[in-house]
Amino acid sequence: MEKKVEAILEFDKIKKQLTEFASSSLGEQAILELAPATNFQVVQKSQLETEEGAKIIRLRGSAPITGLTDVFAHLKRLEIGGDLNGLEIYQIGSNLRVSRQMKNFMTDLLEMGVELPLLGALSDELLVLKEVEEDIAISVDESGKILDTASEALSTIRRTLRRTEDRVREKLESYLRDRNASKMLSDAVITIRNDRYVIPVKQEYKGHYGGIVHDQSASGQTLFIEPQSVVDLNNERKALQAKEKQEIERILAEISASLAGWINEIHHNTFILGRYDFIFAKARFGKAMKAVTPHLSDAGIVHLIAARHPLLDAANVVANDIYLGEDFTTIVITGPNTGGKTITLKTLGLLTLMAQSGLQIPAQEDSTIAVFEHVFADIGDEQSIEQSLSTFSSHMTNIVSILEKVNHKSLILYDELGAGTDPQEGAALAIAILDASHEKGASVVATTHYPELKAYGYNRVHATNASVEFNVETLSPTYKLLIGVPGRSNAFDISRRLGLSENIITEARSLVDTESADLNDMISSLEEKRNLAETEYEEARELARGADALLKDLQKEITNYYQQKDKLMEQAREKAANIVTKAEVEAEEIIHELRTMQLNGAAGIKEHELIDAKTRLGKAKPKTINKTIPQAPKQKPHVFQVGDNVRVLSLGQKGTLLNKISDKEWNVQIGIIKMKIKTTDLEYIQPETPKKQRIITSVHSSDSPVKSELDLRGERYEDALQKVDKYLDEALLAGYPQVAIIHGKGTGALRTGVTEYLKNHRMVKSIRFGAAAEGGNGVTIVEFK
């Protein structure tokens, strides 16, 4: 891509704005070197990196990249055996810390299931040098000062040095507190001269303290004297400072030698972190601009929805739809100057450069932009004074250069094509240049104010007209691009609005040839119809967006509903299974108990014990519970067709096939909802055959073999209870409201057992002994619910 084109389209201003979002000089340097790529796969990867960066910003707000520094020069010094200073070592340690934090940050995101194939792969390349990082952290602070914890020797030296300095200050402060201090000292302060502690003594008392004079005031009236009593202490202090310096140099050399063994790893970490900073800068820039990741086309197709020029005020800029490469490859934008035609050219050109640089573009979702090998632009007055070229000559020189380099993977932007010369010749040249550009296979957008080019879009199948809307009421352009509508002259309307006599306007109209006037009237009518259609389209699109949002909400609610339903069903099944298991265990225990009683012999068992055990066995029997989910019988393979009735397995709902999206997916109508369903999630439902109407009759009839009474006299206890259980079921099915159980009076054991059993039967409403006429207490009357 030519740098000249980047300058014309003001791509450098985009890069300048982008640098404000970088966190380090490494990110800024990557931005300064940024240039549009021309390889489709490279552009695709760059866009995916930016999209992944944007995903991270959406999820986490930021990334732990703060603290990254350019340390490549430091590593060069280590490479040749040099030692680093404290600040340089700290900066390398800071990069190691950022490397570790960034790797942990990315690991957390990946473990959460966030799809980050490119940025995740970058984090795999980061090497964590925890020990080296910790050695630096305990040795150097952010200002580059060597810490006491760097070595035991340094800590000891500094403790001794502090004590020595305290002794010096204490001795000098005693002079300041002396009662004669105000007379002999110019000021009651301790200061430093030549790195020695001194006090300011008046000239006439210089011999009082002895010692060494290190300096004097400008007037000579004050001498800065190191008293003899602290000379030795100051000497000791200087010696300790020398030891401190020597130990610091040793520590720096030791750390430098350690870092020298990791030069390649630190270099690569720093490079990777610089890439991260660059990618996150692109993502934050896109967010600030409310930009989107475009679809990319390697077939020259452009379909920008509500595209905005990124350098214009976002609150006032007019968004336009721009499409090219499908129905036509050339757009000729006609109409008067100052109508916003050039802005359209620059918007398309600049957004193309941005997209091919891996930047998101200011447009709506689902916008598509092409990847071109070349972008050429002949925009503005590039007249060269040095070359003494006219405007026309300058443009023509540029166009000649473009036509020499252009190919089928090129985008050409011509501004005011053919301008600067005789209108008739200029229009003819413009048409010939457009034809030549098309023959080379290029995609072209050109602006012109020549009316002769209005016919170009109609006469060439590869071309279409366009114009920028003009509001006659306000006498200003709306900057709205109208593709398919040629520009028209508004001179008469504007003149009338400005007060020109109607007679003059009428005469002027008569001088315009009829064909031209009819064309302008036709264009005017076409504009009105287009505006109406566009308004209705926008309203329809807004309704469609609302309906789409509602559909997505409904689909989400339906999915949540069935997920919750499945969850509750699963919980119910588990609970039911537990009840059944518990009941089975309890029943087995009771049966075992009964068998034990039988083995012990009836003589040793009381009747009420048997009754109690049998009753507990009845209670242990649970209500019928399905422990397994009914499985649909396996069907023969069915070739799905439009209109088939199906069951959506994941939702448990029936639906109808609307249309086939692919071999793996269908559109299915489920009630009022239309959903995309995978073929593997569908089960064919056979059409139901009409069923014959059945006449339902009463369960019991006059010739029912079930009697209204059961005679148990002479029966053994266990056999009697089994007969009662079976008889009650038959009586219920026969429809009896009540029945009689004849058990006799006897010892009362059978009567007691039957009574206890009936009390616990779920279908028995009440029981009573029979009246005298019914058999007295030898009969139990049972009333059903």
UniProtKB/Swiss-Prot annotation:
Which residues does the UniProt record annotate as the domain Smr? 710-785
Q: Give any single GO term for biological process.
A: rescue of stalled ribosome
Q: Which top EC class applies here?
A: hydrolase
EC number assigned by the record? 3.1.-.-, 3.6.4.-
Q: Which UniProt keywords apply?
A: ATP-binding, DNA-binding, Endonuclease, Hydrolase, Nuclease, Nucleotide-binding, RNA-binding, rRNA-binding
The record's section on InterPro entries has: DNA_mismatch_repair_MutS_C, DNA_mismatch_repair_MutS_core, DNA_mismatch_repair_MutS_sf, MSSS, MutS, MutS2, P-loop_NTPase, Smr_dom
Q: Name one Pfam family in it.
A: Smr
Secretion signal: which residues? none
Locate the residues binding ATP. Answer: G335, P336, N337, T338, G339, G340, K341, T342
Task: Enumerate the GO terms in the molecular function aspect.
Answer: ATP binding; ATP hydrolysis activity; ATP-dependent DNA damage sensor activity; endonuclease activity; mismatched DNA binding; ribosomal large subunit binding; rRNA binding
Family designation: Belongs to the DNA mismatch repair MutS family. MutS2 subfamily.
Question: What role does this protein play?
Answer: Endonuclease that is involved in the suppression of homologous recombination and thus may have a key role in the control of bacterial genetic diversity. Acts as a ribosome collision sensor, splitting the ribosome into its 2 subunits. Detects stalled/collided 70S ribosomes which it binds and splits by an ATP-hydrolysis driven conformational change. Acts upstream of the ribosome quality control system (RQC), a ribosome-associated complex that mediates the extraction of incompletely synthesized nascent chains from stalled ribosomes and their subsequent degradation. Probably generates substrates for RQC.
Subunit info here reads: Homodimer. Binds to stalled ribosomes, contacting rRNA.
What protein is this chain from?
A: Endonuclease MutS2
Which gene holds the coding sequence for this protein? Answer: mutS2
